[in-house]
Amino acid sequence: MDPISREFFGYYAMKRGFHPNSIGAFTKTSAMAFMNFPLMNYIQTISPRPILFIIGEHAHSRYFSEDAYKMAAEPKELFEVASAGHVDLYDRTDLIPFDKLESFFTENL
């Protein structure tokens, strides 16, 4: 199993992230929403509202957030969580940067 599939399997197919209503895989139409809505075409319209991008140091998806950060207008911030993978930031309370989230929302809400 490739590393990305292993990470998601270790979360969604095991007790940690399992849900009884899950079919355990993507459907043929799972990606249709992404294909029909080009997310990055509108990222600059978020400004002047601030954006906080949180990425795991070892997340396979970090490139997506880094690209989104580059495309976003100010104000923006990119925050990296050391030692975190993609799914670690779902439920690993020892890695989720609660202090950063609190300071961001306190300052910007």
Where do the PLM segments sit?
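Conserved loop-alpha-helix segment in the C-terminal half of the alpha/beta-hydrolase fold
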Residues: 57-76
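Short beta-strand/loop motif that positions the catalytic acidic residue
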Residues: 46-47, 52-55
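Conserved beta-strand scaffold positions in the cores of enzyme catalytic domains, especially
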Residues: 78-80
